[in-house]
């Protein structure tokens, strides 16, 4: 997630001294970046609750390479309603990187984030997919508002369909 996988490989192979020192520096920077992102998340207006989803607007503050980590941390924190999945996004050039997390209870009610993000991101000129409980996508940044509205509606429809079928 930092673009420095080679450092981890060298340390795992037994390299020490300068390599280990550099790896520790990268780890410290990564932790500081995560802490900054978590501080940002606690600000008013960064999280927005829609009808069926909770949106985390990472903008250009949350690093696109960390949006999935931040989404996982927040979704497991117990601070969000368990009745709605978290949809986090961050700017990635002219694209937006999206990371979605659901609760086990939502998956049991029929929510499949991987299927929804795969279908919707393709409709918006992007790509996406994943698992029922955790998924990701990338779409053009100028389409994010409409995408989130459609995703909010689609999550509601998917959950309602399963409840209507006696699954919830």
Please provide the spans of the model-predicted regions.
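Glycine-rich, acidic loop segments that terminate in or are immediately followed by a histidine
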Residues: 1, 21, 52-168
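Acidic catalytic cores of enzymes that act on phosphate-bearing nucleotides/polynucleotides
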Residues: 1-57
């Amino acid at each position: 997630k930092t673009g420095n996988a080679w450092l981890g490989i060298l340390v795992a192979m037994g390299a020490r001294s300068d390599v280990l020192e550099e790896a520790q520096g990268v780890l410290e920077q990564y932790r500081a970046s995560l802490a900054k992102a978590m501080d940002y998340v606690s600000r008013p207006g960064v999280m927005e609750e829609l009808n069926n989803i909770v949106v985390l607007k990472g903008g250009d503050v949350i690093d696109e390479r960390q949006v999935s980590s931040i989404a996982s941390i927040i979704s497991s924190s117990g601070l969000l309603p368990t009745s709605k999945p978290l949809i986090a996004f961050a700017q990635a050039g002219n694209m937006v990187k999206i990371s979605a997390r659901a609760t086990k209870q939502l998956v049991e009610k029929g929510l499949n984030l991987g299927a929804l993000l795969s279908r919707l991101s393709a409709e918006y000129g992007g790509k996406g997919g994943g698992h029922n409980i955790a998924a990701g996508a990338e779409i053009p940044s100028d389409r994010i508002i409409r995408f989130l509205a459609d995703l909010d509606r689609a999550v509601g429809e998917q959950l309602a369909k399963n409840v209507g079928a006696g699954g919830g």
